[in-house]
Amino acid sequence: MRSGPDRDGINNSETTQRENGEKRMNQQIEQLIMEIKKAIKGKAEVICKVGMVILASGHILLEDNPGLGKTTLAKSLAKALCLDEDRIQFTPDTMPSDIVGYSILNKETNKMQFTKGPVFTNLLLADEINRTSSKTQAALREAMAEGTVTAEGNTYKLPNPFITIATQNPITSGGTQALPDSQLDRFMVKLSM
């Protein structure tokens, strides 16, 4: 084996290092998929797509009927990646402060103290996102687009990575509404189980 640059001008040792890195990454992806497959059966294509989006630091929208494993997929993914996860169950009366947090009076210091909401996590499961108001969705939109949240005039940085897996029921289900384009634009993919 000769040393030095190959015909593309790339050093052979650099090529070998890159190939070894790709092999390690492929092995890690395969391990991740195998771990998720323990919890979700028969959904290999969806699991692979979700894995790719996670590697790209994207957000995922899962649309399907209740009971098909959307929540189980998100929870098993967080466990397999050893990420902190939290969940928001969206309802028509969910408020932005239910997502980002709120300030309360600290009786010891007599000052307002910010209490972080569930969005301050690595993997957020936004369950039934199309059941809540557009005002509440806007709070999540900032988090997904910028990795920050603004509450009461202050901006807070979210943990890195920050990934949202949102679920929605089909628009034909009662109590649902179509997500606005500005919200849909924050998701890298929309998948069905």
What feature does the model see in each segment?
Residues 5-7:
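Compositionally biased, intrinsically disordered low-complexity segments enriched in Pro/Arg/Gln/His
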Residues 26-65:
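Pre-Walker A (pre-P-loop) alpha-helix and adjacent loop at the N terminus of AAA/AAA+ ATPase modules
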Residues 49-52, 106-125:
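Conserved alpha-helical scaffold flanking the Walker A/P-loop in AAA+ ATPase domains
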Residues 84-96, 153-157:
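Short beta-strand-centered segment that lines the nucleotide-binding/catalytic pocket of NTP-utilizing
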